[in-house]
A protein has these predicted regions:
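N-terminal subdomain of nucleotide-sugar transferases
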Residues: 1-63, 98-100, 236
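Conserved catalytic-core segment of nucleotide-activated headgroup transferases in glycan assembly
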Residues: 27, 194-244
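A short, charged, and often flexible helix/loop element on the N-terminal side
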Residues: 64-92, 144-152
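Membrane-proximal helix-turn-helix segments that form the acceptor-binding/catalytic region
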Residues: 93-94, 132, 144-172
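Short N-terminal targeting/anchoring amphipathic segment
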Residues: 94-112, 123-125
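Active-site proximal beta-strand in glycosyltransferases
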Residues: 102-103, 119-140
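A short beta-strand/loop micro-motif in the catalytic core of glycosyltransferases
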Residues: 103-104, 152, 168-176, 242
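Helix-loop-beta element that forms the nucleotide-linked donor phosphate-binding surface
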Residues: 118-121, 164-199
Length: 244
C-alpha cells in the first residue's frame, strides 16, 4: 500500500531551477510555481554545481535543501551512469524519509534512490524529459573528440541498463508523445502520462508581420546546441535574413 501525504510533495531537481534560463530548469521552475499556486506544499531538493542558492525558491517552497554534486573520477568509474551516480547524496535520502509524502524525481539524473527499499512504500513519480540513452548515443555520434565519444557511448550504455529502474516508479510523466509511447511500451506496469513542458508564457504575444533576423538561442556548453549552432552557421549564407 502506498502512503501519501495530501497536498505535500517532494521534488528532486537535477540542478538549482532558478533562474529559469535553460530548457530543463524552465520546466522544473514553472512546475513548482504552478503547484505552489494550487496550494501544494513543496519540499525541494536541488543538486548544486555552479548555481547559487536562490531566495525565489525559498519563497515558493516549504523547504529547500541543497546537495553538492559528487563529481570526479570516482563517480565516473561507477557502474551507474555518471549523471546519476554523481547525484547520490545520503542527506537527500535522509530528508526524503522524514515524512511519507510523494516524491517527484526530475529526470533520470535524480533517480539514484528510486529503487531504494526504504522508499518502497512511497508514491514515486519520474518526470522524463529525454530518452537519455538515445540522447547520449547521438552526442557520441556528433562529437569529433575521441575521449568524449568514448565517454558518451559508455554513458549511453550505462543509461540503457539503469533505465530499467523505472519499473519502480508508479508514474512516468513524459514531456512528448513520442517519449510517452516509448516508456508505455517498455514499462507496461507503470502508468505513463504525457504532460507537456511547463513555462511562463500564458498567451501568444506574436506581432503582425515578420522580423528582420533569425535568432538562435541555446546553451553552448551543451554539445547538442553547439552542433546545431555550427550547422546553422554553415546555412547562414543561404538564409533570406541575417542569423543572430
Amino acid at each position: 500500500m502506498v502512503n501519501t501525504m495530501e497536498r505535500r510533495l517532494h521534488i528532486v531537481s537535477f540542478d538549482v531551477p532558478y533562474p529559469a534560463d535553460y530548457g530543463g530548469v524552465i520546466d522544473v521552475y514553472y512546475k513548482i510555481k504552478a503547484l505552489a499556486d494550487q496550494g501544494v506544499s513543496i519540499i525541494l531538493h536541488c543538486y548544486q554545481y555552479g548555481r547559487p542558492e536562490q531566495q525565489e525558491l525559498e519563497d515558493l517552497c516549504e523547504r529547500v535543501y541543497y546537495y553538492p554534486r559528487l563529481r570526479g573520477i570516482f563517480s565516473a568509474l561507477s557502474r551507474e551512469p555518471y549523471i546519476i551516480y554523481s547525484r547520490r547524496s545520503q542527506n537527500l535520502l535522509s530528508h526524503l524519509l522524514e515524512d511519507d509524502a510523494p516524491i517527484l524525481f526530475e529526470g533520470l539524473h535524480t533517480c539514484h534512490f528510486l529503487s531504494h527499499p526504504a522508499l518502497s512504500n512511497r508514491l514515486r513519480i519520474v518526470r522524463a524529459c529525454n530518452i537519455e540513452h538515445e540522447y547520449y548515443h547521438y552526442l557520441a555520434k556528433g562529437t569529433r573528440s575521441l575521449f568524449k565519444k568514448l565517454y558518451f557511448f559508455l554513458e549511453s550504455y550505462r543509461l540503457r541498463l539503469f533505465e530499467k529502474n523505472l519499473r519502480y516508479a508508479h508514474y512516468i510523466l513524459a514531456i512528448t508523445p513520442r517519449e510517452r509511447d516509448y516508456f508505455a511500451h517498455h514499462y507496461p506496469g507503470v502508468e505513463v502520462q504525457w504532460i507537456s513542458g511547463f513555462h511562463g508564457d500564458q498567451k501568444v504575444k506574436n506581432q503582425p508581420g515578420k522580423g528582420d533576423y533569425f535568432l538562435f538561442h541555446g546553451k553552448l556548453s551543451v554539445l547538442e546546441n553547439e552542433l546545431t549552432a555550427k550547422r546553422l552557421i554553415r546555412l547562414a549564407p543561404q538564409l533570406p535574413l541575417p542569423l543572430v
